[in-house]
């Protein structure tokens, strides 16, 4: 063949059955040329010229690569639907064939296991074919040689021996496991019985009825702590009993009471745990859980009451309650665990350890008393139903302690003040007696309507009262001081009631209720000073009274109280100069100064004519005159 003929093998392009709609053509133009504002006549002519000079074969190659992208959207959707329909048909066909096979196998097995085979049969097969209607068997099996039968028999015997050996081993293992389980159960129930015999309440858990629990909490506590007082008694693998406390803290926690005096810690309560030996025993675990729960409830109630006592100076922080006792002393309460005690290196003295321990024991006893009161209220008939929610009052834990400490502080102050006055008067040669009856309101109960312990606690919850009676230097003067402290019901705080018996001054009556120590000291000092003036006048009268065989001397003066509230006495003499003495009294000492007067109320300018004498509480100067001797010498 001299010449070769080349024919292009191009695919035939079928014409479309329908024309594209106008929106489709506009979308195609936008995709190919962009927006219409970018299309101009010049750009179209340039494109036509470029197409004329373009290689047609290159166009065919490009068209082959882009043929898949030019397929119409509707055609692609049709192809997609067709492919999905084919896949669905194939899946349905496979499902039908699998169901046919399942029905065949189920019908075949229904002759030997009808119940199991019936569960996998379709409903149509159950209707058209009864169970066990199809069977299979081997027809004309080939004969087996004698050696094969012998081998099968030997293998069967080996399998039987192996199965017997395995069964024997399983029986021995089961016996060993049963023996250990019996030993574990025996140990578990013995320890449970020991816990019950020691007085603990053993019961089923409310939400886990198959488990046992021990009730170590207090039934009269608040609900949040009452529900935490139940712990499960679990059994370990070896049968040992252990306490599952759930969310309860694993470490021992205790309420610590410290005394802060003059900025430093001067005392701390004993916070060592009570359980020190055999900590791992179940009894000690229960005791530790009970004590920790009790301490947490105690601190919770203390903190709850302390928030209410903010107006009385009580300060609450995150884990601390600070109670003011006096200007120099505060009480600190906080909840600590054993790790905090080991890491606490705060320097402190042990001067007030007894006070801290007493406060700690007191609030523990008061919480137990509150539990008894809850039990008493629960056993009584309930109050009438009401839509209003009943408020749960705060327990009396801090208020009785604060009342006792404040009352003791005020009683010690009054006693110290009267002792100072007594020593001052004794150093001046005056006779004075006072009697102190601290806590006179506390009396042991005589009626046994309630338990003795509760009656004793109720006595300390009542307002505290102490009395001081004093006989003044004069023959008829006396006063009585009653110190009353109440921290439970208003009026709160400590009040002083002073009653006076002074015939020389019948109109003098101090205020019935005094709240400040300075005012009490001023009132008592003033009353004693007035009585000293009365004693001076009585002594002078007894000295100037003439007897039956004697006449009064002209040198004796008669003193009169011109300004008694200023401590001044005046003596008017018809023959000599007039005299005046001024008495000043305080807890630090007694001072008397005499003046010579030209007129009735004019003091002498001559300083040599004035005399003064003072007496201190611890004055032991020999030869110093007493008050009456000094006045007589005037």
Curated annotation (Swiss-Prot):
Assigned GO CC terms: core mediator complex; mediator complex
Main location: nucleus
Start-end of Polar residues biased regions: 611-623
Keywords tagged on the record: Activator, Nucleus, Transcription, Transcription regulation
Domain of life: Eukaryota
One GO term of the biological process aspect: regulation of transcription by RNA polymerase II
Keyword presence, Nucleotidyltransferase: no
Disordered as annotated region, ranges: 51-73, 606-626
InterPro entries per record: Mediator_Med17
Compartment(s): Nucleus
Molecular function GO terms recorded: transcription coregulator activity
Chain's role: Component of the Mediator complex, a coactivator involved in the regulated transcription of nearly all RNA polymerase II-dependent genes. Mediator functions as a bridge to convey information from gene-specific regulatory proteins to the basal RNA polymerase II transcription machinery. Mediator is recruited to promoters by direct interactions with regulatory proteins and serves as a scaffold for the assembly of a functional preinitiation complex with RNA polymerase II and the general transcription factors.
Family statement: Belongs to the Mediator complex subunit 17 family.
Binding partners and assembly: Component of the Mediator complex.
Name the record gives this protein: Mediator of RNA polymerase II transcription subunit 17
Species annotation: Aspergillus terreus (strain NIH 2624 / FGSC A1156)
